[in-house]
Structures are given as C-alpha cells and as structure tokens.
Curated annotation (Swiss-Prot):
Required for phosphatidylinositol 4,5-bisphosphate-dependent location at the cell membrane: annotated segments: 833-840
Effect in UniProt of substituting residue 413 to A: Abolishes calcium binding
Protein's job: Tethers the endoplasmic reticulum to the cell membrane and promotes the formation of appositions between the endoplasmic reticulum and the cell membrane. Binds glycerophospholipids in a barrel-like domain and may play a role in cellular lipid transport. Plays a role in FGF signaling via its role in the rapid internalization of FGFR1 that has been activated by FGF1 binding; this occurs most likely via the AP-2 complex. Promotes the localization of SACM1L at endoplasmic reticulum-plasma membrane contact sites (EPCS).
Cytoplasmic-facing ranges: 1-103, 149-921
Pfam families: C2, SMP_LBD
Limits of the C2 domain: 369-489, 514-639, 786-908
Official protein name in the record: Extended synaptotagmin-2
Record has Transmembrane as a keyword: yes
UniProt source species: Homo sapiens
Residues that bind Ca(2+) 1: 400-401, 460, 462, 467
GO CC annotation: cytoplasmic side of plasma membrane; cytosol; endoplasmic reticulum membrane; endoplasmic reticulum-plasma membrane contact site; membrane; organelle membrane contact site; plasma membrane
UniProt note on tissues of expression: Widely expressed with high level in cerebellum.
Length: 921
C-alpha cells in the first residue's frame, strides 16, 4: 500500500509537467482509498455507504472527497510542504545551464543584436514618415504593397507546383481535364511529333548536364562578374543546383517544304520547370541573393547547315528562339525585392532582353563543326525578305464600351497590335469608332519564314483592362508566294469584324538596277528626308577593332562600345571590358530611305570614361558601285590612334516588289486559324512581349521602320473595297491612303492610359504655384512675366509627317528653394495625355536660366495637328520623395496657324495654369 501511495504521489509531483495530473486508475474502491492514505476505519460509515447499491449520494461524496484531497496535496507540494515520511523529489535544473548567482539573467549577444535590428527596421520607416512630413497614406500604401507582394509570390509558387505536378504525371492530369490552350503542340498540330524518346534521353543525361552548368557558372560566369567591377571582386556562387526536373520537349517539328536542300530545320517546343537553387554572395558587402525556381517555355529552332559530303556531314549547328520565351523566376535573399509588384515584371523583362540579345531571332548561337571558312556565311545572316504591312482600316467591330451598367451600348476605342516574330508594332488609338481608319505602314524583317506568321490582334482601349476585338493570323509563306495581298480579312474568335490589309513581300536585290524605279515609287527622289518608305536594307556585321587608344587614363584599357547611325536611326553594340582590341561579332540592320544621299556614321566610344576613341563615316553611295554591293575590310578610324582600325562587313540590298499577274478567280490560303487560346492567356502573352525596354544591347533585335507615309498605288481602292462599302467610303479611303500618318514604329511598352499622376497633381501644383506667386508679390508690383519665359521653335515637317518642337531655353524662372531651381520641361500634344505621348527634357541643376536645346517630335499629320494644342510645363525636379517637386509655369500654344509648315521661334510667357492659350505673334 505504501509503495502504491508513493508511486501515486511521485507521479503527481513530477516537475515540469504543465498539464493537470491525471488520477491513477485502480482496480477497486479499497485500493483507491488505500492509495490516498485512508481506509474505512478513518472515515466511519464511508465504506458502508459506498457499497450500498444504487447510492448516488455516496458516489458524489466519494468523488468530491477525492478531488479535495488531490487539491490539498498539490497545494502543499507547491508551497514546499510534504507528508511526513515522504521525500520531496528535487527539481531538475533549467535548460541552458546553471542559474546565475544573485538572479542576474544571461543574455545572448547575437540574439540581442538581431532583436535590435528588427526593432530598428520597424521604427525607421515611422521616423522617416515624420521627418519627411509624409501623410499616413504612405503607411497604407506600404501595407498594400506588402500584401500584394505576398499574394504575387503565393500565386507564383502555386503555378510552379502545378507545373511540377503536370511534369510528374502528365497523363493523369490530362485525363482529369485541362484547357485546350494548356495542351502541348503535338495535340494541336499533326505534323508535330511527341518524341518521348528524346525526353527519356535528356532525363538520362540530366545529371551530367547539371555538372556542365555548374562548371559554366563557377569557371566562366563567376570570373567574368568579378572582373567587371572592383566592387564585385568578392562575388561567388555558394550553391549551383539546377534541380532534379529535366528540360522537357513537348513537341518536335521537322520542315520538309520550302527548305534549302543543304539544311535541316527543327522546331522544339521546350518547357523547363526547375526547382533549382542558385545562391550567390558578395562577401565584401554581406549581400546574399539567389534563385529558387525557374520556368521557361518557348519554341527553339535548331538549324543544321550546311550539309556536306564529309564527316560529320553537318557544317554547323545554329540555335535560337523564334520569339521571346515566357519566363518566370522566384527570387531569394536580397533579390526578393524583385518580387515586389511592379519590379517583378521589370526584372523578368530585363532578363528576357538579355536572353534576346543572344538567343532570339535574328541573334543566334552558332556551333561550328568544321573549319571557319565553311561557316563564315552563317555569321552574316541575310533576311529572306522584308514584309511591308499597310494597316489600313477595319469595319463592323464590336462595341465594347457600355454605360449605365450595360443598359446603354456604346462604341469602342480600337487599336491594333502587329507581330512578326520578335518584332511588335502598335497602331494609334481611334476614339469611339467601330469602323476606324488607321492608314499606317510598318516594315518588318523576315529571317525564317517557315513556321512564322503575321499575327494581328485588335483591342478596345480602356482605363483598366483592354477588351479583345478579334485576331488574325497570316502565313508568311503564302505572302511570299503571292508577293502582294490587298483585301479584307475576317477576324477570328469574334462574331463580327473585318480588317483591311495590304501586304507586300519585298525581295532583297544584290544590284542597283531597280533602285531608281524603287525611289520613284516611294517618292524618295524628290527630297532628302531620312525617313519614309524604305528603298533598301543595310546589313552590317561588326567584327572587331585593333589598336584602340586608351581613355583618359593612359595606363588603363578602355571599355569600347560602337555606336552606329543612319540618319536619325541609331544602334549600339555590346560593351567589351578592359581591352583595346575588342571582338564583337554582332549583326545590325538599318532600313534606308535613299542610299544615294545617306551615310553610315560609326563611332567607337569608351563607356567607362565617356570619351570618343575614333569615328568613321561611310557614304552609302560607295556601296552602290561595289561588287555585289558588299564591302568587307578594315576601316581606318579618324580622330584616333595612327593604327586604329575597325573591321566590318557592310552589304546593301534594294527592296524590290515583284508583281505577279493573277487570274480574277485566284484563291489563296494566306489566312490560317490559330490554336484555341484563352483571351486572358493571349493578353498576358502580348503584355509580356511588349513590356520592358531594350537593354544596352537590345538594338541587335531586328529593327523596324516607323509608321510612314503611304503610297498612291493605282487600283488600290477598287481592289480592296468591301462588299458593303459605298462610294463615299472609297473616296475616304483614297484620300486617307495617300497620306499615311506617322506614329512610333517598333514599340516595347504599351501604355494606353493617361498619366494619372499628372492629372492628380496638376490642381495641387497650380494652387501651390499661385501661393508662391503671392508670396513673391508681397506688396510689390511684379513684371509682365513674373514666372519667366520659355523659348520654343515649332514647325511641322511634311516630309516626316511630324510636329517638331525644339526647346531652346528658359529665363527669369522663380527660385524653388534657397539653391535656386532644378528645372526641366514636360510637353503633351493635347488632348493626348498618355504617358507614351509625353516628352521631357533633361534636368538643369541649380539655375534660373536653363539652356536645353533639345528637339522632340510628335507623329501627327498637318490637318490633325492644327486642331490640337501644345501643353508645355516647366517643372522643378527633386529627389525621390522630395518636397521640392513642383510647377514653375505653364504655357498652352494653339497650333491652328497657317505658318505651321514654315515654323517659328518665339519666347512665351509662363503662367500659373496655362489657361490662356498663346498663338504665334
């Protein structure tokens, strides 16, 4: 009995037990009473009452007594009391070591520093808000941004998990049901093979591919990054793990038609969903960053050429993407900042631009398998042709704008997006019109027409999300066969709508026999303009340079970069670091308006010290008399060292339209049906291709011409009239097609909505300027121009079809702070206040009489510009979150003047709101 009691007491007094002790279970009531130290003799009558059958009162009393005894013993144990004869179990020592004498607590220094750092990070934004005098709305904005960031990262992780699940069990996922747009290419196209044997081969080779990639990162990329900048001297990859999921090939297509007999063309639909871990560190700045997952999807073309009669039967291997692939990256460490909404799309776009500079058509990776002599032609790719797209008009489009929650149907604000491979164009927006007339022309290079299509999509511009109005896809092989297509095409994926296009396939001629005729057709023989319809194509292969002089420091090697320009079109090569004998091996193309009057200007610059290392000017007329209109040699640089040369290969090709006679009942199959794609996916894809700006080497992408003047082709109106077009429509078409409007050509960012920030800040800035003006007056009489003046030159160029505005200078501006002002000029061509229509000068620091001398242009015709107003605002620039930003003055210039074609230069008075339009005086 004593042993049972001690065991029961010790179990209840076990130190460290946080839960309420359970009552020990006994076989009988006598054992239960003995365990608690009493029997029936100590409590007379208890045993008899407890054994009485059906006694509910006895049961309740027994339970109450037992609970009271347990509570009494527990209170005694907590107060240091114990029953006589029972030893109290010693308390075990606390984890973490013995207790400190005198009750002094031990504090870990790293933990304390971490806690202080977290507290500082939390309190610093609060202090900054108070110091900068910002409102509480910034806190709400930060919280919203944080929530958006977490949601974005969660969605990205969810997409990664779905993609991994699809790769692991593709058959089960397909059987459960997926959308048609998510299926691989071999499901949609019968000529695309699944080639599962290739995936099995890649899976077996994947561990060795990972070893090669790790060596590439550690032995090639890491030393290159360290040598690029002294601040990156401690850069290193701490972990390079590409992951266990191999690259997957969803379909393979081999071209057998319209292919040279000495080449093999394959299209691989690749998909990589990798749970990779790539971590990097810059020890000097305690900076850690990395990538934890990557997704990339796209169509990669592999060309085996030339086929030869000797082993290995293939001269070289060329690899490139037909268009920018889809990319998604999950960042870790410091690069988590790139997952912030707004920055995540920008970071992915920058990486895509870097990939495009090496792997997107016309850029390619060429792996020679034989001697350099046989593959020299591969490093100088010549386009198969040039596609001239006349984007004329549309009819019977859907009305997407509604009012009163859909009760009243309105019209649409249509615009078009045209894509040829990696080249994307966007038309201007026609407000509230279901039969818009654009009358715009684009020119695009076509390097690989098998497998490439002309894709056109129409959208209705809205402030929040643009609505889909229809699409069109045209096979470029059929356009090449027809040479000229001028007709109405029915829009796909919508119930109604037609689009009028004129497509011209221009052949590249290696002689100048047809040049005079081409110049006459495009009206380039009557002016010296540098833009307009193109008559020729300039192809330039930049090879290398030798014996370049040093920069400003004689002992250091320069970082050479080459800038090339023809007229107002300029392109730039990649930067080669720390060398005076750089090797570029890059290709560039320029559309030429009139080769008889235009020159190629080349300048080699030191990017580090921003100085010129030499320049060169090549008249294009020299190429007209050269053999095959091609020159390949080393050119002597001017204003450079005595032996400084640059090696280039330059070729000129005349753009010739070969017209073919067709019977009246001739049919073609140019329009093709696109695979079923969700509208949401389509819009996302287009945005991903149009977002971002080219990087430093982004000019290598095949350039496109701006929208330019049209042509007066005989019979164009009669051939292109739709069934329901009337005489008035034909008259309008003939009138509008004779003067095609100009607008930006190759675009990279689609920003249709107005600049909201400017609209919101305008009333506030005007009010602040009026208060500042009253403070300046303060009982004194101000002059005629209290806010100062601005000098502008305004004219309209009929040759370029553009409004040209030259901002010369400002004088007598007001001081925005004690140090003066940091003025710059912002312009809009009202009523267009979109961000893409904004023009800005550079900022002049700490001056009240800045000199800008900068020229800007707006693509608009003369009749239209005379109905518009030029909005010019002089503003003060400040740093990020600075209080010194504000308006210095405005002026509105009415352009309804007959002298606009001649132009004028004038000083304009600045006012606080610019509400008084000023015309030419």
């Amino acid at each position: 009995m004593t042993a049972n009691r001690d065991a029961a007491l010790s179990s209840h007094r076990h130190p460290g037990c946080a839960q309420r002790p359970r009552t020990p279970t006994f076989a009988s009531s006598s054992q239960r009473r003995s365990a608690f130290g009493f029997d029936d003799g100590n409590f007379p009558g208890l045993g008899e009452r407890s054994h009485a059958p059906g006694s509910r009162l006895g049961a309740r009393r027994r339970a109450k007594t037992a609970r009271g005894l347990r509570g009494h013993r527990q209170r005694g144990a907590g107060a240091g009391l114990s029953r006589p004869g029972s030893a109290r179990a010693p308390s075990p020592p606390r984890p973490g070591g013995p207790e400190n004498p005198g009750g002094v607590l031990s504090v870990e220094l790293p933990g304390l520093l971490a806690q202080l750092a977290r507290s500082f990070a939390l309190l610093l934004p609060v202090y900054a808000l108070g110091y900068l005098g910002l409102s509480f709305s910034w806190v709400l904005l930060a919280l919203a941004l944080l929530a958006w960031c977490r949601r974005s990262r969660g969605l990205k992780a969810l997409r990664l998990c779905r993609a991994l699940a699809l790769l692991e069990d593709e058959e089960r996922v397909v059987r459960l049901g997926v959308r048609a747009c998510d299926l691989p290419a071999w499901v949609h196209f019968p000529d695309t093979e699944r080639a599962e044997w290739l995936n099995k081969t890649v899976k077996h080779m994947w561990p060795f591919i990972c070893q090669f990639i790790e060596k590439l990162f550690r032995e090639t990329i890491e030393p290159a990054v360290r040598g690029a900048n002294t601040h990156l001297s401690t850069f290193s990859f701490t972990k390079v793990d590409v992951g266990q999921q191999p690259l997957r090939i969803n379909g393979v297509k081999v071209y057998t038609e319209n292919v040279d007999k000495r080449q093999i063309i394959l299209d691989l639909q690749i998909s990589f969903v990798g749970n990779c871990e790539i971590d990097l560190e810059i020890k000097r700045y305690f900076c850690r960053a990395g990538v934890k997952s990557i997704q990339i999807h796209g169509t990669m073309r592999v060309i085996l050429e030339p086929l030869i009669g000797d082993m290995p039967l293939v001269g070289a291997l060329s690899i490139f993407f037909l268009r920018k692939p889809l990319l998604e990256i999950n960042w870790t460490g410091l690069t988590n900042l790139l997952d912030v909404p707004g920055l995540n799309g920008l970071s992915d776009t920058i990486i895509l631009d870097i990939i495009s500079n090496y792997l997107v058509l016309p850029n390619r990776i060429t792996v020679p398998l034989v001697s350099e002599v046989q593959i020299a032609q591969l490093r100088f790719p010549v386009p198969k042709g040039v596609l001239r797209i006349h984007f004329i008009e549309a009819q019977d489009l859907q009305g997407k704008d509604t009012y009163l929650k859909g009760l009243v149907k309105g019209k649409s604000d249509p615009y078009g997006i045209i894509r040829v491979g990696n080249q994307i164009f966007q038309s201007r927006v026609i407000k509230e019109n279901l039969s818009p007339k654009w009358n715009e022309v684009y020119e695009a290079l076509v390097y690989e027409h098998p497998g490439q299509e002309l894709e056109i999509e129409l959208f209705d511009e809205d402030p929040d999300k643009d609505d889909f109005l229809g699409s069109l896809m045209i096979d470029l092989i059929e356009v090449e066969k027809e040479r000229l297509l001028d007709e109405w095409f029915t829009l796909d994926e919508v119930p109604k709508g037609k689009l009028h296009l004129r497509l011209e396939w221009l052949t590249l001629m290696p002689n100048a026999s047809n040049l005079d005729k081409v110049l006459t057709d495009i009206k380039a023989d009557k002016d010296q303009a540098n833009d307009g319809l193109s008559s020729a194509l300039l192809i330039l292969y930049l090879d290398s340079a030798r014996n370049l002089p040093s920069g400003k420091k004689i002992s250091s090697n320069p970082n050479p970069v080459v800038q090339m320009s023809v007229g107002h079109k300029a392109q730039e090569s990649k930067i080669r670091y720390k060398t005076n004998e750089p090797v570029w091996e890059e290709n560039f193309t320029f559309f030429i308006h009139n080769p008889k009057r235009q020159d190629l200007e080349v300048e080699v610059r030191d990017e580090q010290h921003q100085c010129s290392l030499g320049n060169l000017k090549v008249p294009l007329s020299q190429l007209l008399t050269s053999e095959d209109m091609t020159v390949s040699q080393r050119f002597q640089l001017s204003n450079s060292g005595p032996n400084s040369t640059i090696k280039m290969k330059i070729a000129l090709r005349v753009l010739h339209l070969e017209k073919r006679e067709r019977p009246p009942d001739h049919q073609h199959s140019a329009q093709v049906k696109r695979p079923s794609v969700s509208k949401e996916g389509r819009k996302t894809s287009i945005k991903s291709h149009m977002s971002g700006s080219p990087g430093p080497g982004g000019s290598n992408t095949a350039p496109s011409t701006p929208v330019i003047g049209g042509s007066d082709k005989p019979g164009m109106e009669e051939k292109a009239q739709p069934p329901e077009a009337g005489p008035q429509g034909l008259h309008d078409l003939g009138r509008s097609s004779s003067s095609l409007l100009a607008s930006p050509g190759h675009i990279s960012v689609k920003e249709p909505t107005p600049s909201i920030a400017s609209d919101i800040s305008l009333p506030i800035a005007t009010q602040e300027l009026r208060q500042r003006l009253r403070q300046l007056e303060n009982g004194t009489t101000l002059g005629q121009s209290p806010l100062g003046q601005i000098q502008l030159t305004i004219r309209h160029s009929s040759q370029r079809n553009k409004l040209i505005v030259v901002v010369h200078a400002c004088r007598n501006l007001i001081a925005f702070s004690e140090d003066g002002s940091d003025p710059y000029v912002r312009m809009y061509l009202l009523p267009d206040k979109r961000r893409s229509g904004r023009r800005k000068t550079h900022v002049s620091k700490k001056t009240l009489n800045p000199v800008f001398d900068q020229s800007f242009d707006f693509s608009v015709s003369l009749p239209e510009v005379q109905r518009r107003t030029l909005d010019v605002a002089v503003k003060n620039s400040g740093g990020f979150l600075s209080k010194d930003k504000g308006l210095l003055g405005k002026v509105l210039v009415a352009l309804a003047s007959e002298e606009l074609a001649k132009g004028w230069t004038q000083w304009y008075d600045l006012t606080e709101d610019g509400t008084r339009p000023q015309a030419m005086t």
